[in-house]
Amino acid sequence: MTTAAERKYINIRKRLDQLGYRQTLSVDSLPLVEKLFSDLVHTTESLRQCRLSSGKAEKESANLDFVLEPYKLENTRLNKENNELYLELMKLRECSDKHIKDLKTTLKKCSRETADLKFLNNQYVHKVKVLEKESKAKDEKIQQLQEKNLRAVVQTPGGRKRNIAFRRQRMQIDEPAPPSEVSAYPVPQPEDPYIADLLQVADNRIQELQEEVQQLQEKLAQMEKGVLDYSKQIELREREIQRLSLALDGGCSPDVLSLETRNKTNEKLIAHLNVQVDFLQQANKELEKHIQELMETKETVTTEVVNLSNRNEKLCQELTEIDQLAQRLERHKEQVLETADKELGEAKKEIKRNLCEMRNLEEKMSKLQWELDLSHKEKERLNSELLLKSDLETVVHQLEQEKQRLSKKLQSFAVTERELTLEVERMRLEHGIKRRDKSPSRLDTFLKGIEEERDYYKKELEKLQHLIQRRSCAINYSAREKPPVVKCSEKGDCSTDVHLITRERDELQRMLERFEKYMEDIQSNVKLLTAERDKLNVLYKEAKEELSTLRKESTNSTSPNHLVSCVEKEKERALSELRRITAEKEALREKLKNIQERNAVGKSDLEKTIEHLTYINHQLENEKYELQSKMLMMKETVESLENKSKLQAQKLSHVTGDSSHQKTEMTSLRIVSEQLQRSLDDCQHRLSIKRGELESAQEQIKMLEQKLENLSHRMTVQSEETHAMKKTIGVMDKEKDFLQETVDEKTEKIANLQESLLSKEKVIAQLKVTVAEYETSLNQLQETLTTRDREINSLRRQLDASHKELDDVGKSREISFKENRRLQDDLATMARENQEISLELEAAVQEKEEMKSRVHKYITEVSRWESLMAAKEKENKDLLDRFQMLHSRAEDWEVKAQQAEGENSSVRLELLSIDTERRHLRERVDLLEKEIQEHINAHHAYESQISSMAKAMSQLEEELRRHESEKATMLGDVSSLRELCIKLDSGKDVMTQQLNSKSLELERAVAELENVKSESELLKKQLTNERQTIKNLESLLATNRDKEFQSHLTSHEKDTEIQLLKEKLNLSESKLTTQSRETSMLRTKVTQLQTDYDNLKRQMSNEKYERERAIQEMRRLGLPTSPLSSTLKSPVQTPDHINA
């Protein structure tokens, strides 16, 4: 009890001295001080835990701020998206309003144009009615002149004039009628109040249009002023935006974004107003063109009337010539018809003959085709049988290879068994083997399996021999039946050849079925062989395991000689059975060779049959050389067969791949066996090493016994070393605290870095999503651009067509100008009006020149827009290239991020391992501290004991002679002291080893800390680089968004332009339809006039014919024909007179 209390006292005293409490301590107050000390330790630990928890709480609060940052960023992003959506909504509203306004303007234009067209239609209808009335009046007058009931005066030979009552009365005109004073017949005024004078209406319309043009010019000036004001305001806003962007370098607030969006909307409004101004200018130009076209249509109508009158005269002359030609043609037609009837009769006879010949030829062709189809089918079957034969040969070859492989395997098994016997003999010589009940049973099972394999191979050989005998019989049968086939072919009877071919076909089909069965048997045999191979592998593994267990047992224990003799006998039996199996295997090989020779014979027979069939096929082809054109169908079948052969080659490659897989498995098994042999060699080497270690340990024991004697001298040195150890332990404690603080800081930093990495991963994921969205939007824009380009190309084509039509109209316009000049010469009365019209025409020409200049400007603008489009296409290409670069960079960054994630995971794992090692170290340090304190206490106790013993020894030296009985007790004490010294020496060695291990661990920890510091610095650098790259990416994304926004604006402007062009096209199409309707109306009128003209011509021809008859009758009667000639001349002049 006293020793325990003294130990407690010493321990508490030392701890108090370490903590700085140097006050005196009584023995009575020991338990109280112990409790107080334990409470102090508990409070310090609780303080540490509180500090750790407070630090963790602070970290969590910092983490909360860090976690809230992405939410804040998302909130700002959502605000931006909301603003953008609002802007898009405003844009859509503006677009809808503009579209409604454009539709209203188009409606107004259409209503005006319809009113104008109605007006023109009414005028044209009125003109047509007037012309119809004039034509009717002229027709009536002509009829009156022709059919007046005047008496014909006939001049007799005596010079008298006599009235003829019974002849038709003819009008005698001595002189032409005097020209009428009135230039034209009075035209009744139209009853329709909507019809008015065209010139007055045109003048009024021109004045109205001029007023509208002036109003539009005033509006244009106002709009230009407004545009200038807007441009100034935009410049001021841009300056303010630049100032605000300089003020807000860190980030953009939603107010700034709203200002930017407002500026962009203002710019869009200005662009839209410019587009509207251009549209109004174009509308003015179109109105002016429409006025010119109306004037031109007016002139063309007048010219057409004159042209029709001239054509009527020409047609009268042409009709007489046509009548003569018609008579000639009728005569020629009658002759041609007669000859054609004769030729038709002959052709019908020839056609009947050809039809009969064609039917006969078709019947022959059908027969030949049927025979050819049969021959082709038989050829295809023979080809398929050849392919099956080749497949069988490949399978036989594979089986030979597998048999060779199995023979090699058996040889390897024999070699391994020999090695096993050698090892067993060696083990028997060294230690002896202890027999168990399991090994002979496994060997029996192995031998039984080998016997079953032998029986199985024998059965398969018998099956193969049976199949080959059947095939040889079938071949011999076919060979016997060949000579009559040849005789039949020599005779040339096709029917006998067909029967023989059908028989051979049936035989080949049977052979095919047999071969298929044989193939199925071979496949099943292959499956069974693979299963048996797996079983052999399992048995081989089990044998290896048994060998390993036997080796272990041989190392652990020794076996008697009779067990070894039994094992050797069993081994000899197994070897004899293996030899017997190898002999059987060689017999099987010889049988396989015989089978292969028989296969070769069968192959030669089949080749002969194939040659005979090819000879028959050649004969058929020589007989039917006319149908060579239809042999192209055979090529398709050959191609299909080639495809089948390719598929079968692929199957063969798969089979070879399986065989290579089996070879790899065998190589792996060999490698495993080699590894097991190496492991056995390593175990033997280790055994020899351990024996040497045992000898060295015995030598060390002897050395330690010598060292124990020197320990008494080293005790003094050890006391000094313990003091140094205390100092070093205190320094180590300080370093340990410092390291713990640094580790805590590093863990905090690592946690922060992990959180930052998580946030960056989220940002990267968002960027990926945005990049994908941009990709989809770019694809959509490209599709829209392609569609727009197509529409523009179609519109350009339409414009080219309209330009061509305008050129045609210009040509017609020149013709109409020429006709107008003729009309001006004819119409002297309209000179004043023509002068006024010429002045107006000059003004219109000036306006036309102005319009041409405007058109040139418009063309220059179009070229400029085309250049802008090309530049924008280049920009789009650059954007695509940049996008690809960004995509590649993003992929690189993804790879880097994945690498960083892997590094982070490795760092986390390292940190976890460091934490675990640190905990282990702490536990070891605590244990070592406890042990050190115990050893120190023991050392102090020993020191006190040694001091007391020294005193006692001095006393005993003085009292040695007196107290010989106390010597024995002192010797016992010395022996106990020696034991304690031995224990102390051993403890010292352990302590030195532990100190060395601790020093090594500290060095490792310092190196790891340095590595961690370097890695953290690298991570910081990477983080800074990633931040810079993210900023660059954000700037690039912002620029891309701006460019996409600009491209969207341009596309919107292009859409508006395309809509305007479409509207223009619709207007032009509507005008074309109206013009086509007018032309159709005019054509109908022209047809009516032509019909009237034909009627007049007929009447004239009838009159001419009657006059000629009258002249002939007068000549017969002997009357003079001069008055009749005058009468003939007069009606020729009458139409001119009437036209005048």
From Swiss-Prot:
The record marks K101, K104, K108 as: Microtubule binding. The modification Phosphoserine is found at S439, S688, S1130. GO terms for cellular component: centriole; centrosome; cytoplasm. It is found in: Cytoplasm, Cytoskeleton, Microtubule organizing center, Centrosome, Centriole. Its main location: cytoplasm. One of its GO terms (molecular function) is microtubule binding. One of its GO terms (biological process) is positive regulation of non-motile cilium assembly. The keyword Phosphoprotein applies. Residues 75-151, 199-416, 447-644, 668-1036, 1079-1113 form a coiled coil. Transmembrane segments: none annotated. InterPro entries: Centriole_BasalBody_StrucProt. PANTHER family: CENTROSOMAL PROTEIN 135KDA (PTHR20544:SF1), CENTROSOMAL PROTEIN CEP135 (PTHR20544). This is Centrosomal protein of 135 kDa. The lineage of its organism: Eukaryota, Metazoa, Chordata, Craniata, Vertebrata. The gene is Cep135.
